[in-house]
From Swiss-Prot:
Pfam families: PCRF, RF-1. The keyword Cytoplasm applies. Peptide chain release factor 2 directs the termination of translation in response to the peptide chain termination codons UGA and UAA. SUPFAM superfamilies: Release factor (SSF75620). It comes from the Bacteria. It comes from Campylobacter jejuni subsp. jejuni serotype O:23/36 (strain 81-176). GO terms for molecular function: translation release factor activity, codon specific. The lineage of its organism: Bacteria, Pseudomonadati, Campylobacterota, Epsilonproteobacteria, Campylobacterales. Methylated by PrmC. Methylation increases the termination efficiency of RF2. HAMAP family: Rel_fac_2. The modification N5-methylglutamine is found at Q251. This is Peptide chain release factor 2.
Length: 365
């Protein structure tokens, strides 16, 4: 990097921070924080625990947003001042240090962008994730299990907690279906970027001839709904099936029909839960999953999303990302246009940067 390149970078970052400031309006955030502080000092505030909790979450979110803005604003100002001073004194050592720290400065601005992008109504919620393999038998089932592991590792990296709601093992390898709840700050905000079809190209370990195979898996993500959000489900629109939960190798793990499957006829959505030994608890969780999916479906309709509705055919039509392991190694996201060569790292859960690139790209559209 040289003087000209760094100068252009500073201009770009200054424009970004300026645009973000015009959107989030830091002065309005400060005013709102003062209002919340006054509310908290009122004796009657804590009598409504539910409302206090809602306002508490709002306070945390906007405090973090303001903090990220101030960090970015101050870092950019400091870099500008130091750059001007170093140039006026022909201080090559300081200039070199600034050039070396350019990526850190960019990361600070990116953190602000992501903080702004994750300030939506549902972004802070927990996420319900379901993975379904496409046609292709064992190969597709294995691909679904690879994706499942990738998300588990991502959750570990981010400090998210995972609760498996339903898991159906594949006959030879992999899995037929999995649903899990991800708990943590902005879990849905991040994982909503994974909604869609994921394509794998590789030499199949299940093909004795060593041929190249293409597999697809569908990932569906919806926010875990708060109790105050009401989704009406009519009894005539659903069918509830009860069956015995199965474990590894298809063995039944208990003697009662504790597992629950709910089919929603108008949308074709099917959810199932076998996480608990209690049929009653599994039924309650399955209804929660269904409401979450219906809510997500409505959000997609409102946003006029290309991925509206159930993915009736898993294939090229709704593909969001390709993972190529052979004849070369690359992961490419169709929405951001970004390509990554560190395939092993990505499949080991290092997907945060890729997700952030998608969030920024979608916001720019």
């Amino acid at each position: 990097m040289d003087n000209y390149e760094f100068s252009e970078l500073l201009k770009t970052l200054k424009n970004k921070v300026g645009n973000i400031a015009s959107i989030i309006k830091p002065e309005n955030i400060q005013t709102r924080l003062k209002e919340i502080e006054e509310l908290e000092n009122s004796p009657s505030f804590w009598s409504d625990v539910k409302q206090a909790g809602i306002i508490g979450k709002e306070k945390t979110k906007i405090t973090n947003l303001l903090k990220n803005y101030e960090n970015a604003f101050n870092a950019l100002n400091d870099a500008n001042e130091l750059f001007d001073l170093a140039n006026s004194e022909n201080d090559t050592e300081t200039l070199e240090a600034l050039f070396n720290d350019a990526s850190k400065l960019e990361d600070t601005i990116t953190s602000l962008e992501i903080s702004m992008l994750l300030s939506g109504e549902n972004d802070g919620k927990n996420a319900i994730v379901s993975i379904h393999p496409g046609a292709g038998g064992t190969e597709s089932n294995d691909w679904a299990s690879i994706l499942y592991r990738m998300y588990l590792r991502f959750c570990e990296r981010e400090g998210f907690k995972v609760e498996t709601l339903d898991f159906q093992e594949g006959e030879e390898a992999g899995l037929k279906d999995v649903s899990f709840l991800v708990k943590g700050e902005n879990a849905y905000g991040y994982l909503k970027a994974e909604n869609g079809i994921h394509r794998l190209v590789r030499t199949s370990p299940f093909d004795s001839a060593g041929r190249r195979h293409t597999s697809f898996s569908s990932v569906m993500v919806s926010p875990e709904l708060d109790d105050d959000i009401e989704i009406e489900i009519e009894e005539k629109d659903i069918r509830i099936d009860y069956y015995r939960a199965s474990g590894a190798g298809g063995q039944h793990v208990n003697k009662t029909e504790s597992a629950v499957r709910i089919t929603h006829f108008p949308t074709g959505i099917v959810v199932q839960c076998q996480n608990d030994r209690s049929q009653h608890k599994n039924k309650a969780t399955a209804f929660k999953m269904l409401k979450s999916r219906l809510y997500e479906l409505e959000l997609m309709k409102q946003q006029d999303s290309a991925n509206t509705g159930e993915k009736s055919e898993i294939g090229w039509g709704h593909q969001i990302r390709s993972y190529v392991l052979f004849p070369y190694q690359q992961v490419k996201d169709n929405r951001s246009g970004e390509a990554f060569s560190q395939v092993d790292n990505i499949l080991d859960g290092d997907i945060k940067k890729m997700i952030e690139g998608v969030l920024i790209a979608l916001k720019a559209e």
